[in-house]
Amino acid sequence: MPRVIVNSTPLIILSNIGKLELLKKLYAEICIPKAVFDEVCAKEDSACQRILDYPDWIHICKIKDESQKRMYQAKLHAGEVEVMILAQENPVADLVILDDNAAKKTAKFLGLKVTGSLGVLLKAKKENLIREVTPLMKQLIANGFYITRDVFDLVKNAAGEQLPPFR
C-alpha cells in the first residue's frame, strides 16, 4: 500500500462526511505536515478531534528545510507548501493528497504524484470500501466543498454510476 502526505482540506472534508478512516484502509502510512495539523486544529471541531483520536495512523511530520517555504507561499497556503516540501524531502512518499487546483498544478510541476478527495473516494469504491461515490459527493457539496457539474459527472462516470439520460 502506498504512503501519502495529506493536506488539510481532504482531512477536514473526509472527516465531515465520516470517511476519514478510508485513508487508513487505502494507504500504508498517512503523514501530515505540522502546518496542516495547525490548520485543521485552528478551530477545535470534529476534524481536529478525529485526528487526535487516531494518533497511531496519522503521523505529524516536520519538514527539514524551513527556508524552502518562502518559494511557494505567495500563492499557496502554509499546509500546501509543507505537503510539497515534505514529499520532496521524503522520496518514500508515493502520493500527495491536495484539493486546491493551484496546489495540484504546483505539485505536478514538481514531479509529485497527486490526487484529491474525489480521487480517494474513487479508489475506495474500486477497492470495494464504499458502495457509491455519488451520495458522498452530495454530502461534500452539502458541507461546502465545491464540485463543478462537469467534475461531478466525470467522477460519477469514472465510478461507473448512472448518469441521468438528459440534463
Say what each PLM segment does.
Residues 2-95, 101, 109-112, 154, ...:
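Active-site-proximal, substrate-binding regions of enzyme catalytic domains
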Residues 104-167:
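Acidic, PIN/NYN-like endoribonuclease modules and their adjacent C-terminal/linker elements
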